[in-house]
């Protein structure tokens, strides 16, 4: 017996079966940055149409988490896909660098600003800390395979960007959108300063909980608003009853808030020994609770109405000669109290927001030290927490105290002093939503933007419709300054504010924000300096990031305004999408983006958020170190990001399995292109074997589908289609069929070259389809493909070699897709024969396909080549009427299959069992086909 191994075309490739991505990827990254891959892409796409994805800046604090990874990978997939679509798509990453979390980190190490370090030194430490965090995050982002201008990112703390933020504010002021007002903030009376949310901790505390009567100003008018039975209007004074655990805020009461759709009841309280009859207004759901709390047993309901029916009603302040209105708000609940909410806009966020809608005074009688100001009636000079008891006594004295008790609840405390804090209105700077039509302009612009998913539009519309004026000022140390001068007497801006702000911006551009804080007013104002106060407030960090469309898109070379796309998590409808929209319209009357895409949050397999305490955190660093960046990228791309994205070790393992299928397909393609030179060996379409031509046509049509999915940001659809093609049409059909021809046909013969031509076209396309998602693996494949080529797949365009193949003829496509189904039936029959010990491998089998006339005609077209398509040694077609009872029948077509074991010897080279094996002179162990392939001109194939 001869050894024919040397006559076979055995697959050969340097592309390993195992990816070893965790070890291989870092080496590839090293090369990418040594050879300036990003710069090469920019040169390759110079002059092409621009596509600008503007990066929403992550905060420069802490390690990246899985949500960061999702966000950056999605952006990278889009940028790479757009680059392949022949766009010049630069990606400039950014970081948000100012604000409280960084201050707190520096404070932990160096103490409060102004203590161990002066303010300038403290700011410098903040800058240094932010830079260390940026470096750490940048390393992780690059490890994900995200390509961008990492050496030149935008940082909101770069001097130029700090200066441009001041210029952005100047433009907003110039357009008339900024004004001064009041807003309640967390206030520590021990610190004597405002606290941010992060500086507040909650502890249990006992507070006096009081129910307070607020008499109605017009009794008859009030009763008329309730649907009461005729003649049953009750007797006694009418009051609306409020409930509060902060009696010290009663002097600042300026309204009572009800829920619009809630049912309210007019309740008759009957006279008792020590109390005359009276009527009270309460939420119907809380009547029983209130009566029980007040120890009232004799009462009945007189009438009902909705909260909206009581809007505008005037009430008497419980302590002062003052009338306050009834208003409506969304924050009213029936969880506790009376359903009638005491509203002091100077001492609560909800109170402030609802008060703004009604134009209600923001009254704050409390000074920095927590003491009532001198002009506060009755309680001037008293500390608010010591005033609770005198206020309760006064309410009792004037007959407006319904009930008082001690109430234990969670209450905000200062994280430094561990003492209770208050809400207190302080002067702040606002961007007005309505003064110059900003809200209307923003709502108009929202309609012009494409939102992915579509519900994003209604979500941001409702938020913009309901949002209050934007408070842009903060009393912080580390931030961009509100670089303005205010008249000490009138509180008006300096008349030359715009020119002064430009001068300040120039100083900041040179020396950073410290230039403003060091600036002596005389330097710019000269003799006028005494008349003006230099504002020391800093800008809300949402303003910093919200004006990056101005500071980055309009200022960085190679970018342009507006952006084509903003892409962030769905929480950014409230955050960056909205701050960017508001500033864009305030500055330029236009949204700074054409499209907005949002992704959901990551949750575990049970739908729970990632939490260290639960122990379900999936760290991207761990995934990359264990499985590799491409597995993480494949998971992100295959998830439907429009909702919550589920991730767990098991889900990532499934992604790794899917990756292996793609890798194995790629390896087969590369291994069978060994020795193939497209310049010499490529077969023209019309000369190709029909099956080869068909699969290339399928790939061409698939490319059109994939490009559409990429353009619509449907990456999970890209992955599904790619996996289906690799697993079904290639893996279990085409590649399975062609192995015999590929390995045994004459090396230089048309039968094999046709097959290699198909594999080459598919490989050239597949590597590009994969590149945006499995970037590392795509480049690994690219390096091993035949033919001269550029260094990187990322500088390329989608495969252009499909032009003549796209649009496979319907009849041809239908036949091969039908054959795919026929093979499934044949495989069932073969499997049954294996179980029955009739055959071992499929090449021991001879099959008969019993079909109706139409199908039989289609199958007979293949003639001798049908057996190759079915992977059997013989295949013949007969009438369905002659099918034996034990034949395996198809469910969806007129087909039955029977299997018999071949009686012929096996060819030692191709393993087919053929009649002539053992009869050929000089080659007694070969079939005629193999002899032709070894010694002749090679077999001919037309179909398969």
From Swiss-Prot:
**Where do the annotations place L-isoleucyl-5'-AMP binding?**
568
* Biological process terms in GO annotation: isoleucyl-tRNA aminoacylation
Q: Where is this motif: 'HIGH' region?
A: 58-68
Protein biosynthesis as UniProt keyword: yes
The molecular function terms of the Gene Ontology recorded here are: aminoacyl-tRNA deacylase activity; ATP binding; isoleucine-tRNA ligase activity; tRNA binding; zinc ion binding
Q: Where is this motif: 'KMSKS' region?
A: 609-613
GO CC terms in record: cytosol
Q: Which reaction does it catalyse?
A: tRNA(Ile) + L-isoleucine + ATP = L-isoleucyl-tRNA(Ile) + AMP + diphosphate
This entry's comment on the bound cofactor is: Binds 1 zinc ion per subunit.
Query: In which domain of life is the source organism classified?
Result: Bacteria
Gene3D superfamilies this protein is in?
1.10.730.20, HUPs
Cofactor(s) listed: Zn(2+)
* Subunit annotation: Monomer.
Task: Tell what the record comments on domains.
Answer: IleRS has two distinct active sites: one for aminoacylation and one for editing. The misactivated valine is translocated from the active site to the editing site, which sterically excludes the correctly activated isoleucine. The single editing site contains two valyl binding pockets, one specific for each substrate (Val-AMP or Val-tRNA(Ile)).
Q: What does this protein do?
A: Catalyzes the attachment of isoleucine to tRNA(Ile). As IleRS can inadvertently accommodate and process structurally similar amino acids such as valine, to avoid such errors it has two additional distinct tRNA(Ile)-dependent editing activities. One activity is designated as 'pretransfer' editing and involves the hydrolysis of activated Val-AMP. The other activity is designated 'posttransfer' editing and involves deacylation of mischarged Val-tRNA(Ile).
What is the official name of this protein in its record? Isoleucine--tRNA ligase
Q: Native species of this protein? A: Idiomarina loihiensis (strain ATCC BAA-735 / DSM 15497 / L2-TR)
Task: Tell me the gene name.
Answer: ileS
């Amino acid at each position: 017996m001869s050894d024919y191994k040397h006559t076979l075309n055995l697959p050969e490739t340097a592309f390993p079966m195992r990816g070893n991505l965790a070890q291989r990827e870092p080496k590839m990254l090293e090369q990418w940055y040594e050879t300036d891959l990003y710069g090469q892409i920019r040169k390759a796409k110079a002059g092409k149409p621009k596509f600008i994805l503007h990066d929403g800046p992550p905060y420069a604090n802490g390690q990246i988490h899985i949500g960061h990874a999702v966000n950056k990978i999605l952006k990278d997939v889009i940028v790479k896909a757009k680059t392949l679509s022949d766009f010049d798509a630069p990606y400039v990453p950014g970081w948000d660098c100012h604000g409280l979390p960084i201050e707190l980190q520096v404070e932990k190490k160096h103490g409060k600003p102004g203590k161990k370090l002066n303010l300038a030194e403290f700011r410098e430490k903040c800058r240094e800390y932010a830079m260390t965090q940026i470096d750490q995050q940048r390393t992780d982002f690059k490890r994900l395979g995200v390509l961008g201008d990492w050496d030149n990112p935008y940082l909101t703390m770069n001097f130029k960007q700090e200066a441009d933020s001041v210029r952005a504010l100047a433009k907003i002021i110039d357009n008339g959108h900024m004004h001064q007002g009041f807003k309640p903030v967390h206030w520590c009376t021990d610190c004597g300063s405002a606290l941010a949310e992060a500086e507040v901790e909650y502890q249990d505390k006992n507070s006096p909980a009081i129910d307070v009567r607020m008499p109605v100003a017009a009794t008859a008018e009030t009763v008329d608003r309730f649907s009461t039975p005729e003649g049953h209007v009750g007797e006694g004074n009418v009051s609306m009853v409020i409930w509060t655990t902060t009696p010290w805020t009663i002097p600042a009461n300026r309204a009572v808030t009800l829920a619009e759709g809630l049912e309210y009841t007019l309740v008759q309280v009957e006279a008792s020994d020590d109390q005359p009859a009276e009527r009270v207004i309460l939420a119907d759901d809380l009547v029983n609770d209130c009566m029980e709390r007040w120890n009232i047993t004799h009462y009945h309901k007189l009438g009902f109405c909705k909260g909206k029916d009581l809007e505008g009603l005037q009430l008497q302040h419980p302590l002062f000669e003052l009338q306050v209105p009834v208003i409506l708000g969304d924050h009213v609940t029936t969880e506790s109290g009376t359903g009638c909410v005491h509203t002091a806009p100077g001492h609560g966020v909800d109170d402030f927001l609802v008060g703004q809608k009604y134009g209600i005074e923001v009254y704050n009688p409390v000074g920095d030290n927590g003491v009532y100001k001198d002009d506060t009636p009755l309680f001037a000079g008293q500390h608010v927490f010591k005033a609770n008891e005198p206020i309760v006594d006064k309410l009792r004295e004037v007959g407006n105290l319904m009930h008082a008790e001690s109430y234990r609840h969670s209450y905000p405390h200062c994280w430094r002093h561990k003492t209770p804090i208050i809400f207190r209105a302080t002067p702040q700077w606002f961007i007005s939503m309505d003064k110059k039509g900003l809200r209307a302009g923003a709502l108009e612009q929202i309609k012009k933007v494409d939102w992915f998913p579509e519900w994003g539009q209604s979500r941001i519309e409702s938020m913009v419709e309901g949002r209050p004026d934007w408070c842009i000022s903060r009393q912080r140390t580390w931030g961009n300054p509100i670089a303005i001068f205010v008249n000490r007497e009138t509180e008006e801006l300096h008349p030359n504010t715009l020119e002064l702000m430009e001068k300040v911006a120039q100083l900041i551009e040179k020396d950073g924000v410290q230039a403003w804080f060091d600036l002596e007013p005389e330097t710019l104002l000269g003799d006028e300096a005494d008349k003006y106060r230099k504002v020391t407030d800093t800008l809300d960090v949402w303003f910093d990031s919200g004006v990056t469309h101005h500071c980055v898109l309009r200022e960085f070379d190679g970018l342009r305004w507006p952006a084509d796309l903003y892409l962030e998590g769905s929480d950014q409808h409230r955050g960056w999408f909205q701050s960017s929209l508001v500033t864009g319209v305030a500055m330029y009357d236009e949204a700074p983006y054409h499209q907005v895409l949002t992704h959901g949050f990551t949750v575990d397999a049970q739908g729970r958020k990632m939490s260290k305490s639960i122990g379900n955190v999936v760290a991207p660093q761990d995934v990359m170190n264990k499985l590799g960046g491409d597995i993480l990228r494949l998971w992100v791309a295959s998830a439907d990001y429009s909702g919550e994205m589920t991730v767990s070790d098991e889900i990532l393992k499934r992604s790794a399995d899917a990756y292996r299928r793609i890798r194995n397909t790629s390896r087969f393609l590369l291994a069978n292109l060994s020795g193939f030179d497209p310049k010499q060996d490529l077969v023209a379409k019309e000369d190709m074997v029909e099956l080869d031509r068909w699969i290339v046509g399928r790939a061409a049509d698939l490319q059109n589908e994939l490009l559409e999915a990429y353009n619509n940001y449907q990456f999970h659809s890209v992955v599904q289609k790619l996996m289906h093609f690799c697993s079904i049409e290639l893996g279990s059909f085409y590649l399975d069929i062609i192995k015999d021809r590929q390995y045994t046909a004459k090396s230089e013969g048309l039968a094999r070259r046709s097959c290699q031509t198909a594999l080459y076209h598919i490989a050239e396309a597949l590597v590009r389809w994969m590149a945006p998602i499995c970037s590392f693996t795509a480049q690994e494949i690219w390096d091993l493909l035949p033919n001269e080529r550029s260094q990187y797949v990322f500088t390329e365009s989608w495969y252009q070699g499909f032009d003549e193949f796209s649009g496979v003829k319907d009849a041809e496509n239908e036949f091969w897709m039908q054959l795919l189904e026929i093979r499934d039936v044949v495989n069932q029959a073969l499997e049954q024969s294996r179980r029955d010990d009739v055959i071992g491998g499929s090449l021991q089998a001879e099959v008969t396909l019993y079909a109706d006339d139409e199908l039989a005609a289609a199958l007979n077209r293949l003639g001798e080549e049908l057996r190759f398509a079915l992977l059997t040694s013989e295949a013949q077609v007969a009438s369905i009427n002659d099918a034996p009872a034990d034949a395996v029948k198809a469910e969806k077509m007129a087909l039955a299959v029977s299997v018999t074991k071949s009686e012929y010897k096996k060819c030692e080279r191709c393993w087919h069992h053929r009649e002539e094996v053992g009869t050929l002179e000089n080659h007694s162990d070969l079939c005629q086909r193999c002899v032709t392939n070894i010694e002749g001109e090679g077999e001919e194939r037309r179909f398969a």
